[in-house]
């Protein structure tokens, strides 16, 4: 109700100025401004993410060591295995590294936890690797807390490259580690999904085979009335400074190294002659590189920048130097310098989009860039063949991935049949792909019934759901461990507090639990101090898993209860992006709002508030008639999922209503109809 509504209060003058400078709709500018995106550059980065904005994979700690170790294994013919988590983040990660190794002529043995095997790497799996003669294991979306198991593997002569994104413990495994969450990580974005980390490793490996690997490029430009230079190595910009005119000769003679490759951006003949006199291995003009890699015929630097900026989605805003544009064009060209490498990255990035959304990672920063690009690739008819088979001709969006594709493909792992999902992603037989989609779809229908039935059972058997305890837990041997997290998440959303759901003992007599928080409450921070009570514990602040001996269940739950305390703080505020006159709603407005996609965690669909609404009619619909629909004005539907009763009560009063809602277009018979999706209702003042 209104007590929990919070409408964003923006500076109207600044919003108008931002909209005018960026050439965007004022409503979109207002939403962005309210979410802290308030400069032309940040608006451009958000609405038009560029491939060159992705951080270099070599900024990740351990990346050079990982590349060197894998290349040594490939050169010497070592047997390599990939070990992944069994969810979609893990399986998409496995798919990328498996395909990479296949293309590098070294097919890998793949392994992941199977039904009732428990959580993560085990000694039994290590023994399996040893017996197969494997000497290098690459973990994807897991491994950062498998300290004892990796230590055991090292004693068996097996090395590990751990690519993971889960929270590390204070002790780390004896392996090459690639994880943006490491305490000493210098990587600019810590919220990559597991598949994002795997993608970075694949990119680094592909880069290492290019002639540009470990070469320092020096971009020198004459722009804005002066000279500028930038050092770039492996996509990392290390120095970006101006030069006084008088110091250009000194710079060329004293700072340039004999191994440097120089790229000139709009420089005159005098600078070219100075640089050429050094006898460097490479000196080229930026526009000539563009002609080579983009198959263009530019005759000058200015013509090159003018032609490539829109192609690369680069925009010049106040405060952006011409030199900075030249550097960004160079980074784009370097990424595209190999058709084979760029083609593989385009092939892999839809997998990153699906895995990142499926793991509910923040849709901001680099994640947003990769998701945007991955969805664009799928909508162009390219990318993973199985994903294209699922989507067909329908437009792919973050919503279709999170509501349809990810739940479907997560089903086999949740039901203890991970092999089906792995085969779906790895097979190259399109007929087999179609068979698998049919099997997985049937399994998904079964999964929905089981989850609904289990939730009803828990509600019936549990009295503690409505108590003021800081969290709720439930254990049942019949619950499939793969469904525990999904059930916990649904119940947490319902009762608005953290939930733990535990399944029966695995092959080693361990209880396996999945914990889900509510809102932004850091549940893991209250459980992590109790780590000695668990066989395994790991994950994220709001979603984590664990195992412990079955006989310890009461002791463990009591300890968590003491740590969490009573009634942990929660935020029920509904944050509204903008007030909107409902008469302004049409399908064109909703289409313009799609610029804000992809949506997800930390970039939720915008919420609007319309006041003093007169409801024309009310109708129930759905199998159980538990959904409601208002007709507002002449043609706008306002639907409320599972809100039939409350909508009836409000409409039958005859009073005007204030409604908080999302907007969507409903397609019917090839026409778009605007629709409000109700979040909350109250009487108008």
Where is each model-derived feature located?
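Conserved DEDDh/DEDDy metal-dependent 3′-5′ exonuclease domain
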Residues: 239-296, 319-330
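Acidic, Mg2+-coordinating catalytic module of metal-dependent nucleases/exonucleases
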Residues: 194-198, 204, 275, 303-345, ...
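OB-fold single-stranded nucleic acid-binding module
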Residues: 552-558, 646, 653-685
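Short alpha-helix plus adjacent loop in nuclease-associated cores
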Residues: 176-182, 280-308
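Single-stranded nucleic-acid-binding OB-fold domains
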Residues: 225, 618-624, 641-643, 664-674
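Beta-strand/loop nucleic-acid-binding surfaces
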Residues: 635-651
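Hydrophobic helix-and-loop "lid/oligomerization" segment in the mid-to-C-terminal part
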Residues: 2, 12, 18-136, 156, ...
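Accessory interdomain/linker segments of ATP-dependent helicases and helicase-like nucleic-acid enzymes
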Residues: 578-640
């Amino acid at each position: 109700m209104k007590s929990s509504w919070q409408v964003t209060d923006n500076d109207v003058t600044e919003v108008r100025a931002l909209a005018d400078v960026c050439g965007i709709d004022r409503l979109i500018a207002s939403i962005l401004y309210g979410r802290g995106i308030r400069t032309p550059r940040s608006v451009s980065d958000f609405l038009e993410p560029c491939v060159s904005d992705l951080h270099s994979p070599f900024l990740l700690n351990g990346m050079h060591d990982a590349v060197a170790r894998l290349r040594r294994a490939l050169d010497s013919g070592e047997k390599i295995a990939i070990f992944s988590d069994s969810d979609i983040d893990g399986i998409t990660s496995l798919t990328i590294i498996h395909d990479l190794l296949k293309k590098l002529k070294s097919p890998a043995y793949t392994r992941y936890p199977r039904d009732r095997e428990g959580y993560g790497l085990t000694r039994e799996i290590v023994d399996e690797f040893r017996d197969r003669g494997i000497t290098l294991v690459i973990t994807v979306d897991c491994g950062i807390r498998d300290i004892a198991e990796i230590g055991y593997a090292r004693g068996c002569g097996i090395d590990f490259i751990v690519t993971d994104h889960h929270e590390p413990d204070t002790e780390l495994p004896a392996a090459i580690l690639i994880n943006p969450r490491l305490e000493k990580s210098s990587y600019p974005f810590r919220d990559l999904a597991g598949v994002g980390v795997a993608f970075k490793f694949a990119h680094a490996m592909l880069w290492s085979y290019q002639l540009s690997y470990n070469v320092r490029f020096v971009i020198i430009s004459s722009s804005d009335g002066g000279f500028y230079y930038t050092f770039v190595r492996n996509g990392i910009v290390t120095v970006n400074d101006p030069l006084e005119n008088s110091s250009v000769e000194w710079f060329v003679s004293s700072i340039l190294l004999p191994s440097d490759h120089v790229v000139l951006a709009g420089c005159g003949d005098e600078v070219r002659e100075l640089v050429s006199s050094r006898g460097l291995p490479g000196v080229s003009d930026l526009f000539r590189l563009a002609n080579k890699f983009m198959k263009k015929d530019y005759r000058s630097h200015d013509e090159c920048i003018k032609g490539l900026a829109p192609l690369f989605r680069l925009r010049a805003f106040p405060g952006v130097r011409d030199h900075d544009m030249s550097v960004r064009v160079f980074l784009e060209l370097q990424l595209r310098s190999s058709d084979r490498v760029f083609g593989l990255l385009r092939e892999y990035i839809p997998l990153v989009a699906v895995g990142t959304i499926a793991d509910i990672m923040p849709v901001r920063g680099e994640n947003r860039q990769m998701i945007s690009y991955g969805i664009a690739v799928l909508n162009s008819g390219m990318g993973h063949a199985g994903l294209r088979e699922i989507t067909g001709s329908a437009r792919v969006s973050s919503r279709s991935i999170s509501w349809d594709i990810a739940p479907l493909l997560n089903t086999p792992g949740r039901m203890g049949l991970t092999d089906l999902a792995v085969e779906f992603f790895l097979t190259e037989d399109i007929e087999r792909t179609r068979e698998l989609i049919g099997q997985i779809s049937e399994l998904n229908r079964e999964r929905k019934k089981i989850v609904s039935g289990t939730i009803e059972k828990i509600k019936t058997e549990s009295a503690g759901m409505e108590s003021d305890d800081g969290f709720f837990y439930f254990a049942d041997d019949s619950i499939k461990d793969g469904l525990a997290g999904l059930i916990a998440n649904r119940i947490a959303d319902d009762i608005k507090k953290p939930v733990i759901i535990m399944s029966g003992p695995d092959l080693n007599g361990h209880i396996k639990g999945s914990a889900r928080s509510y809102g932004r409450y850091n549940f893991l921070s209250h459980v992590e101090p109790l780590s000695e009570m668990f066989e395994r514990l790991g994950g994220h602040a709001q979603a984590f898993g664990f195992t412990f001996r079955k006989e310890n269940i009461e002791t463990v739950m009591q300890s968590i209860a003491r740590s969490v305390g009573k009634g942990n703080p929660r935020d029920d505020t509904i944050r509204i992006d903008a007030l909107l006159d409902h008469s302004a709603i049409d399908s064109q407005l909703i289409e313009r709002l799609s610029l804000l996609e992809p949506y997800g965690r930390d970039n939720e669909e915008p919420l609007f508030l319309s006041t003093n609404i007169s409801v024309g009619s009310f109708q129930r619909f759905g199998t159980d008639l538990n959904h409601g629909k208002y007709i507002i004005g002449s043609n706008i539907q306002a639907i409320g999922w599972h809100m039939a009763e409350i909508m009836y009560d409000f409409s039958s009063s005859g009073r005007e209503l204030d409604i908080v809602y999302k907007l969507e277009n409903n397609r019917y018979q090839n026409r778009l109809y605007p629709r409000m999706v109700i979040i909350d209702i109250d009487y108008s003042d």
